[in-house]
Amino acid sequence: MRCLPVFVILLLLIASAPSVDAQPKTKDDVPLAPSHDNAKSALQHLNQRCCPTFYFCCNLSGG
């Protein structure tokens, strides 16, 4: 029963500690885009790249 206050205080200290990144940021770090944007961008790139040669891929973007 004596350990409970110590345990609670430790939890509060851990929760209020500032977060530290595991890996330092470099100048090359780029924020990630949402996966929906990545898929849309990939389809647009695919359309631009293959449509002049392969017409079946022109309808992949749904438009």
UniProtKB/Swiss-Prot annotation:
Keywords per UniProt: Disulfide bond, Ion channel impairing toxin, Secreted, Signal, Toxin
Keyword Oxidoreductase appears in the UniProt entry: no
GO molecular function: ion channel regulator activity; toxin activity
Tissue note: Expressed by the venom duct.
Similarity section: Belongs to the conotoxin T superfamily.
Reported function: Probable toxin that inhibits ion channels.
Stated name of the protein: Conotoxin Am5.1
Species of the source: Conus amadis
